[in-house]
C-alpha cells in the first residue's frame, strides 16, 4: 500500500535546498553517475542479440545502417545480458535517464518486447486458462504515461515496432471510453494513463476528489461509460513508468503507487528526461521502493542538456508592455524566417514550418490564441478541457505530431485542422463578426500548456517552441524547450519575460506573485537563472521588433 507520509524534499517547493554537482542533483544522496562516451557509443542494431523481428523493425524505421543513440546503447546492452534473461520476475529495477529527443521510448520498448517475445506463451489465452477471462483483461506488461496524447503516440509506435514480432498491443487512450474496449483475455502490452488504469483496476475516487478533479479540468474528457475492474494485475511481468519525473511527482505520486500496488510482482522500468532531487529522494527513502534492491541507473552523457542544434532566443519586452502582442509579432517573424531559409535551401516543397507556444495556464492559452486570431494568425488552442480535445483520438493535434511508419506502410494523412461544423471560433474581429474559417485546412501554430510538454514527439516541421512565461525551474525549461531540435534536427526556443541571466522583464518584476517564475531575488533574478546557462547552447538576445541585440 502507498505510504501515508510524503517523503522530505518530495517536491521542489518544500524549502529544502537543492545542491547540484556537475549539473546533477546531489541532495539527499550522493550524485548519480552519467555513463561515459565509450559506454554509450553508437552501435548497430545487430550488436545486442535482439529478437530478429525487432531488429527488422528498427532497420525499417532507421535504415539498414542505422545505429543506436546513447540511451539505447546503454539500455539494449543491459537488458540483453544473459543473467538478466534468467533473472526472476520482479528483480529488475532500472532507471533510464536521457535528454529529450534522444530515443528514450525506443530504449524501453525494445527491451520490453525482447523479453516478452522470449517468454511468449503463444496465442491469446482462452477462458479455460482464466476462469474469468471472458470478463477481464490480463496484461503481461503495463506502460503508464501522464497524458492520453502521449499514450496514443506511444501505442502507435509500439504497434509499428511489433509489426514483425506479432506481440499484441492495446492502448486505452485510443478507445472512446478510455478503457479496454472489447479486449478480453490476454494482451502482451497495455498502455494507459494512471487514471485509466485506476478505473480499470476498479479503484475509485471519493466524491469530493472527483468533484475537485472535475472543477480543475473544467469537464471530464473520459466519462465512466465502461464498467470498472476490467483489468487484473496477476499476470503482469513488467511495468514501465514513462515520464517518471511527472508520474512520481506531486500531482500523480499517490495514484501511481496505488496502481503499482495492484501488481503482485513485476520488473520495473522508470524513464525520464530529468532527474530532479525529489525523484532521487523518493527512490532511496520511500518504503515502497526501498523494500527491494536499489535501482540501476542508466544515464545518458547528455542528460539535462538541450538538443545540440537548438538555438535559444531571448526576446526583450517592448515599450508597450503588451507581451501577447510581442508573441504575435514574433510568430510572424519566425514563420517568415523559416520560409526564407526553406527557399534558400531548396526546401520549398516540404511541409511548412510550425510553432508550438507553451503557456502556464488555460486562461493564458485563451488570451494568446485570441490575440493571434485578431492578427489573422490561425492557431490551434489545446487545453485539458478544450473543445478540440476529443475522446479516443488526437484529431487536429496530429498535424503537429511525428508520424512514424515502416516502409510500404505510409501513415494516413492527418485530419484537417479545422472542422467548421464542430469547431467553435476562438476570436472575432472589431465588428463582432467571425472570420470565415471554413477555407482554412491547416494551422501552423499550436498554443497549449505543459500538458503537451512531456514526452510527445513533434513533427520535424515544428521548428520553434515559444515560452510565453518563464518555467518554474530549469528542469521544466528543459522539457518545454526540448520539443524542438529533436533527433539532431535544428530548431529554436523563443523565450519571453526572462533573459539568459535569469533577469525578468519589467512587467514580470512587478508581478511578483506570478506563477511559474520561481522565487524572485533582490537583484531581479529568478532561481531559474542560477542554472540556466548550464543547459544553454547557442543563444541570442533579440529586441521586440526582431533586431538582434547580441549573441
From Swiss-Prot:
Any one GO CC term of the record: mitochondrion
Entry keyword annotation includes Membrane: no
Transmembrane segments: none
Motif DEAD box per record, residues: 242-245
Catalysed conversion reaction: ATP + H2O = ADP + phosphate + H(+)
Domain Helicase C-terminal, chain residue ranges per copy: 334-551
Positions of ATP binding: 98-105
Family statement drawn from the similarity comment of this UniProt entry: Belongs to the DEAD box helicase family. MRH4 subfamily.
Helicase ATP-binding domain ranges (all copies): 85-293
GO MF annotation terms: ATP binding; ATP hydrolysis activity; RNA binding; RNA helicase activity
Name of the protein described by the UniProt record: ATP-dependent RNA helicase MRH4, mitochondrial
Notes concerning its domains: The Q motif is unique to and characteristic of the DEAD box family of RNA helicases and controls ATP binding and hydrolysis.
Keywords on record: ATP-binding, Helicase, Hydrolase, Mitochondrion, Nucleotide-binding, RNA-binding, Transit peptide
Keyword ATP-binding (UniProt): yes
Residues spanned by motif Q motif: 43-73
Top-level EC class as recorded in UniProt: hydrolase
Record EC number: 3.6.4.13
Organism annotation: Cryptococcus neoformans var. neoformans serotype D (strain B-3501A)
